[in-house]
Amino acid sequence: MSSVLYDTPGPRAKRRNILLSVVFTILLALLLWWVWQKMDDKNQLEWSLWEPFTTSAAWTTYLLPGLGDTLKAAAISMLIALPLGAVFGIARMSDHAWVRGVAGTVVEFFRAIPVLLLMLFANEFYVRSTDISSEQRPLYAVVTGLVLYNASVLAEIVRAGILSLPRGQTEAAYAVGLRKGQTMTSVLLPQAVTAMLPAIVSQLVVIVKDTALGGVMLGFTELLNSRSTLAANYANVIPSFIVVGIIYIILNFLLTSFAGWLEQRLRRSKKSTGAVLGEDTVEVNPAAVGGTFGTGGEGGGPSGFTFTDKPPR
């Protein structure tokens, strides 16, 4: 059976791919030209509408403060949602039925509710039950909604990552004397996070974008809300949307690039483990393990394990 998803394209497939690429490029160019013409017909390309973005006032008064609030809300939400999601993800696999039940109920409940509804409910709760100032209340409500929703989603991501690992990882950890908690924190969870890092990063990107919901509904002065204030002062609605959209794209691209770099670094560190242990260290794999576990097999390995340099016959 072939180990690749697709066979190498032949001459006809290559010609077809080239033709489709050319057609797609032409259609994309026509779409961009149509958008450009429509904007020009509506006078949205006039320099007077774009000129404010070349001045420091538009950035220091509107965009940069809004970007700062966006990053602050997203960073706080990430710092709380990541460990909280890991805790609930692990709790859903507990040996105790009541722990699994409580964790599963919490995760499914908050995952089913729209994040905007959670923000609105949190805002009303802070208005009626706390003394938080009106200036800080939108930030608290946005962070609360983002944490409750995204922690439940991250819990499922972590649980799926742990369940995707081979059972041999757990058995090997038990064989060397690790308890279940140590196995989870030292063996399974680090590997699960590495394996599910793309999904985790995608959820972090969602957190950054969902901060805009607080600006629309709660008056939170994040980037999109600051854009509306800028557009009201300079009467450049479409240009301001385009500039803010580019800022979001750059922000999420940087986050994704950092995650890709981190994933490669983690994988390289795993590959270099043997070099750190030393040249004389024998790397043991399941195929090279002699003896049996718990039956008093030959050799001096722990709990009846025998480690040999050669595979068993």
Model-predicted regions and their roles:
Residues 1-313:
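Transmembrane alpha-helices and adjacent helix-loop boundaries
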